[in-house]
From Swiss-Prot:
Encoding gene (name): secG
Its membrane topology: Multi-pass membrane protein
The protein's name in its UniProt record: Probable protein-export membrane protein SecG
Native species: Staphylococcus aureus (strain MRSA252)
Family, similarity comment: Belongs to the SecG family.
Functional summary from the UniProt entry: Involved in protein export. Participates in an early event of protein translocation.
Amino acid sequence: MHTFLIVLLIIDCIALITVVLLQEGKSSGFSGAISGGAEQLFGKQKQRGVDLFLNRLTIILSILFFVLMICISYLGM
């Protein structure tokens, strides 16, 4: 059981890294923060299509990561 959870954790980590790297950057760097990037921060922008899917998948994989870590640490006691 412990080995199975560790294998799931490794797969989850690889998937999480891949999904994060596939996402587009949301800011225009340091210059955007100084010269009016606040309107993007506080403006209502809806994510659509692939961006929305990648965002939700990142959240799901992150939650799965923490649940697996808690289960592995609980079984390790």
